[in-house]
Amino acid sequence: MAEMEKEGRPPENKRSRKPAHPVKREINEEMKNFAENTMNELLGWYGYDKVELKDGEDIEFRSYTTDGESRQHISVLKENSLPKPKLPEDSVISSYNISTGYSGLATGNGLSDSPAGSKDHGNVPIIVPLIPPPFIKPPAEDDVSNVQIMCAWCQKVGIKRYSLSMGSEVKSFCSEKCFAACRRAYFKRNKARDEDGRAETFPQQHYAKETPRLAFKNNCELLVCDWCKHIRHTKEYLDFGDGERRLQFCSAKCLNQYKMDIFYKETQANLPAGLCSTLHPHMESKAEGTGVQLLTPDSWNIPLTDARRKAPSPVTAAGQSQGPGPSSSTTVSPSDTANCSVTKIPTPVPKSLPISETPSIPPVSVQPPASIGPPLGVPPRSPPMVMTNRGPVPLPIFMEQQIIQQIRPPFIRGPPHHASNPNSPLSNPMLPGIGAPPGGPRNLGPTSSPMHRPMLSPHIHPPSTPTMPGNPPGLLPPPPPGAPLPSLPFPPVSMMPNGPMPVPQMMNFGLPSLAPLVPPPTLLVPYPVIVPLPVPIPIPIPIPHVNDSKPPNGFSSNGESFVPSAPGDSSAAGGKAGGRSLSPRDSKQGSSKSADSPPGSSGQALSLAPAERGRGEVVDLTRRAGSPAGAGGQPGFAGVLHGPQDGVIDLTVGHRARLHNVIHRALHAHVKAEREPGAAERRTCGGCRDGHCSPPAAGDPGPGAPAGPEAAAACNVIVNGTRSAPAEAKGAEPPPEQPPPPAPPKKLLSSEEPVVNELESVKENNCASNCHLDGEATKKLMGEEALAGGDKSDPNLNNPADEDHAYALRMLPKTGCVIQPVPKPAEKAAMTPCVISSPMLSAGPEDLEPPLKRRCLRIRNQNK
């Protein structure tokens, strides 16, 4: 906006032009200005300095020198009104120049009125609402046209309406609002500062002459955290460093992060030299020591060569610390012995077998498998030793080495170059291939060994192999650069003898073969870390077997199990022979479904058939009332009735992909057929749903009666399609065998009257609305029920109250087979949700549990 107003172009022109940065900047500036104004007003209310978002990067903490030049980082609101010892002109200007890059801070109009150098500044900036120079017109423009100024408060360019003389500068404001806000903010700041009295606590601020006029509380100054670069209005900034390099952090977290960052950077800066010096052969220092101190802040100031000389070689130190072995470590080069400060090396336990620090023992030349060093003397205190091809090795070390070899064969693979000389630094081979020139022997020891030494597992004691600390590196031929662990004291795994992996104790050091890839401060643990790999363990989750698709003709679609039945089942015969006028298809389906029981489940289907015979007239599905076949089939069924009774015979339409099956528990009970008043009417309502309803079965009482005793077998006849023949209601009269429960005799209550009461409470699942049966479905249901010989109607089904209970579990105390036709809601106008109640065979409730669960599952699937 400022530039546009200066140029005299209306914003429309600029927008009309191809959109460029100015347009974006304008939008951003407007939003920033709005945010700044709002925030500054809020801050002003609470006595805080105004914040200029534009200067977020530049609101600096304390001044600290950069390139020897005292940088003055002036906070957004640094008050220049206080008379201060003047800084050199160039220093103040330099601070402003530095800040200008970030829409730097400049004092309001004072910048144009008086050069920055002429203003009174303490060595440390004072809070003053500063205007970023980019938005300040050149002094010439300001002088020429005082009409337009940049408001010292809202930072917008506008006509000068108010001005406030603040000591050395005059602040101009574009409106009374800005003027009042600025005055209020200054007043609150000064008041807070006076109350706090902490102005003197900041030594950086030299308040030589404190004028009470507009002295600002310094600790309310907008400070920017040196780490997170956020402006925190906290009085507890943490100072770090001294003098001009003092940094301020808003929290201990930022301070710690800063320290870590510095540590990391310095470590990286020093690390390459350290690694190179130790990894690349510095011949002169090789003999002087094989250990290097861990990189610490103190060591950064020490030349690496000195550090190398000072660092005790961990192996020698370990050897000396170890009882018998170390005493004999005379072969160690004098520098090594001198350097060995046992205190610095955490030798875990002096148990470890100092593999011949003793001069008497010849150094183990790490040769290819052929050259296996003689067994080395074992000090009396050493742990149980395992004799390997290389000689005795402490058992724990041997075990670890074997594990390591198995885990990291590639690293162990490199052919070890044996150093015949006892001084060869095999302890150092741990940093094997790190840029070591293939040509020269290398002194890896300094960095590698100390690094790995302390990491040794407590039971791994730094063994000092003769080849380890004092061996002159010159004797160690450099491994090929590619060899992973060229200097490992044992041959590559491929060359290893078949016997137990003869890994010398050196593996303690050898394990850190990864060290070259890791900066020295990282400690490589020489013992294998077992990382558990998750192995999926199958957890069996029982999933009910539900057949949503139409079962084959030979199977009933109970969803529980397909019950293939011999086609010759009497129920099938009954279904077809039952004189009912069922379409052959219906009868066929009924026969197939009702006859679906294999020997295992035949009891279900057969018991179903007798029960249905008892119910024959009630269930008009495909059975004729007096179907002799049904009656004849009863004896066969009777035998089977007592078979598996948990099965559920589903008389639902098999072709329905959706599962309309309601699973009823097979209950061992005698079918008690009773008539329920109005049952006929109910049944008739939807009886001839598709016109497929067979003529009313006048009487199946005969079949029903024999079925009664046989009905003891558990049968779950589930008819999900609501098929009821009007005649069915009339038809079956309760067999004399079955005592009718106190239900009206008009309707056959297949001993379900009591059940009905229970079912009413339990809410039988009559999915009248959920089960949509096509005409074929209804036909099939009719056929199936006829085959089942449903003699009795299920009062529960007939009870409208029961029809509501779609999800109720069937708590059938004694009732067994329930042919539950599920009405298909208004799929066809003729199809009214008439429920065919089928007699329930009263059965022992002991079988209730699994079928109830299955039934619940089926109900749930149905209602889905």
UniProtKB/Swiss-Prot annotation:
A motif (SUMO interaction motif 1 (SIM)) lies at residues 618-622. Residues 1-14 have a biased composition (Basic and acidic residues). One of its GO terms (biological process) is sensory perception of sound. Residues 317-338, 417-432, 565-582, 590-603 have a biased composition (Low complexity). The modification Phosphoserine is found at S627, S694. Residues 460-484, 733-745 have a biased composition (Pro residues). Keywords: Isopeptide bond, Metal-binding, Phosphoprotein, Repeat, Ubl conjugation, Zinc, Zinc-finger. GO terms for cellular component: nucleus. A motif (SUMO interaction motif 2 (SIM)) lies at residues 648-652. The keyword Zinc-finger applies. Residues 1-25, 304-355, 413-484, 550-615, 725-751 are annotated as: Disordered. There is a cross-link at K672 (Glycyl lysine isopeptide (Lys-Gly) (interchain with G-Cter in SUMO2)). One of its GO terms (molecular function) is SUMO polymer binding. A zinc finger (FCS-type) spans 142-180, 216-256. Interacts (via SIM domains) with SUMO1 and SUMO2. Implicated in development of the cochlea. Belongs to the SOBP family. This is Sine oculis-binding protein homolog. It comes from Mus musculus (Mouse).
